[in-house]
Amino acid sequence: MSTAPGHTAVLTMELQRGVVGDLSTLAELRDAVADADLLASVRRLLSAARAVSIPVVHATVGWRSDRLGTPLVTPIARHLAGNPAQMLEGTPAVELDPAIGPDLDVDLISHRHHGMAPFTGTSLDALLRSMAVTRLVICGVSLNVGVLGAVIEAVGLGYEVSVPTDAVAGVPADYGAAVLRHSLAPLALLTTVDELSSLWRGAL
């Protein structure tokens, strides 16, 4: 498995102000992200990717105020829907967290209103294939649901996947570590931001 720059893209998962940042109502996840200094690690990863022209795609989520297009079919969705302001379209909560250093003149966005993972029912796969991407570096949150779902969907669609372990988080932390070891290690190359950055610099 290779993570060399050619045919590679970086995919961030839900690194938004209302998920991991100052407007998050998910206190345990927000604290885990802060404790791991995750956003700084992601910022370094994205900077390294852009330096070698690796595309960065941000998978984001937002809800309409009437919840149209957001089936409340899971316990977590029903719980979050109890907050009328939860991830409302057009509000600061859906913005990318500035701590990751998004470059909206260069980066791409794949937005959804439904589900827990980024591919199903979105144009993400078509977007990646239009850029001849065959390898993904997936980072963000959470190892509990979103990152795990993204990896499984990506592998099912034929992508090779790498996961930088210092650029993902789950709650509690020991469970996140178990997901990496027992669920993601059989599916993806586990690496680090520094390892990827060094590899990409060496490919120049």
Locations of regions flagged by a protein language model:
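Active-site-adjacent betaalpha module
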Residues: 1-9, 47-52, 69-70, 76-204
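N-terminal nucleotide-binding beta1-loop-alpha1 segment
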Residues: 11-15
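Short acidic, Gly/Ser-rich segments with clustered Asp/Glu that frequently serve as metal-coordination loops
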Residues: 16-21
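Short glycine-enriched, charge-decorated loop/helix-capping segments at active-site entrances
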Residues: 25-34, 85
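Residue-level preference for long, well-ordered alpha-helices that form the structural scaffold
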Residues: 31-38, 172
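A short, N-terminal amphipathic alpha-helix
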Residues: 37-55
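N-terminal, charged amphipathic alpha-helical interaction modules
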Residues: 49, 59-64
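Short beta-strand segments at enzyme active-site cores
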Residues: 54-61, 164
